[in-house]
Amino acid sequence: MPHPLLPDLETLATKVAASKGFALCGIQLLTHMSPMTLEVQIRHSSGADVSLDDCAGFSGVLGDALEASTLLTDAYVLEISSPGIGDQLSSDRDFETFRGFPVEVHHRDKDDSEQRLEGLLLERDADTLQINIRGRIKRIARDCVIGVRLTSPGS
């Protein structure tokens, strides 16, 4: 069950993030820690990488907003980070960045049954996703792709 303060903290963090050109990716209040810890994950609204300086700058601004709000009355630690790289590929940038990496493609075939294929990511264009499966190129219609995720080599 989430902490009762979490919705208010999320609203505050979302507003502060938007005012600084960030989007809130996640927030957790870890009350089992001493002092409790508020973990906040941000990303740039533009999609640019989040730097350590971005996290430090946002920490100061959000810390001031938290103090002014008096939502957290006990001692707490504020941790700001970026979400890092997830294993799901979604943006064009993801597909460019991870070209040549091992992926698992979850898709629907011609009979509308779900299939999973593993191979090396070659390319994604407006119409197809291409992967290399043991030296053979497999083209999958983009509208049949359910999801693409990074895998470990040989997994």
Curated annotation (Swiss-Prot):
GO BP terms in the entry: ribosomal small subunit assembly; translation
Q: Which NCBIfam families match?
A: PRK14634.1
Q: What gene makes this protein?
A: rimP
Where does this protein come from, organism-wise? Synechococcus sp. (strain CC9605)
Gene Ontology CC: cytosol
Family stated for the protein in its record: Belongs to the RimP family.
Keyword set includes Zinc: no
Name the job this protein performs: Required for maturation of 30S ribosomal subunits.
Which protein, by its recorded name, is this?
Answer: Ribosome maturation factor RimP
Q: What InterPro entries does the record point to?
A: Ribosome_maturation_RimP, RimP_C_sf, RimP_N, RimP_N_sf
The alphabetized UniProt keywords are: Cytoplasm, Ribosome biogenesis
Per UniProt, subcellular location reads as: Cytoplasm
Q: What is its main location?
A: cytoplasm
